Amino acid sequence: RTCNKTFSDQSKICPPGENICYTKTWCDAWCSQRGKRVELGCAATCPKVKAGVEIKCCSTDDCDKFQFGKPR
């Protein structure tokens, strides 16, 4: 499986056993100025999240695309 990774402009091959791609988003103290924080990566199962955190999981190559906004 290949998934997009945080801080990379190219998808990466996931480690053996990690066949799920995920996109996790949440707000921090800078959310109103910078937008939501984003984490992209691979996992063996869809990660569990806390309140206020959104996660999307998928199981095809490079399915964890995220449209980053333009800096202000």
Swiss-Prot record:
SUPFAM superfamilies for this protein: Snake toxin-like (SSF57302)
Tissue specificity of this protein: Expressed by the venom gland.
The keyword Disulfide bond is annotated on this UniProt entry: yes
Superkingdom field: Eukaryota
Disulfide cysteine pairs (residue numbers): 3-21, 14-42, 27-31, 46-57, 58-63
GO cellular component: extracellular region
Subcellular location: Secreted
Keyword Transferase part of the UniProt annotation: no
Keywords, comma-separated and alphabetical: Acetylcholine receptor inhibiting toxin, Disulfide bond, Ion channel impairing toxin, Neurotoxin, Postsynaptic neurotoxin, Secreted, Toxin
GO MF annotations, alphabetized: acetylcholine receptor inhibitor activity; ion channel regulator activity; toxin activity
InterPro entries recorded: Snake_3FTx (IPR003571), Snake_toxin-like_sf (IPR045860), Snake_toxin_con_site (IPR018354), Toxin_cobra-type (IPR054131)
CDD domains: TFP_snake_toxin
Primary residence: secreted
Family: Belongs to the three-finger toxin family. Long-chain subfamily. Type II alpha-neurotoxin sub-subfamily.
Protein task: Binds with high affinity to muscular (alpha-1/CHRNA1) and neuronal (alpha-7/CHRNA7) nicotinic acetylcholine receptor (nAChR) and inhibits acetylcholine from binding to the receptor, thereby impairing neuromuscular and neuronal transmission.
The protein, known as: Alpha-elapitoxin-Dpp2a
Record lineage: Eukaryota, Metazoa, Chordata, Craniata, Vertebrata
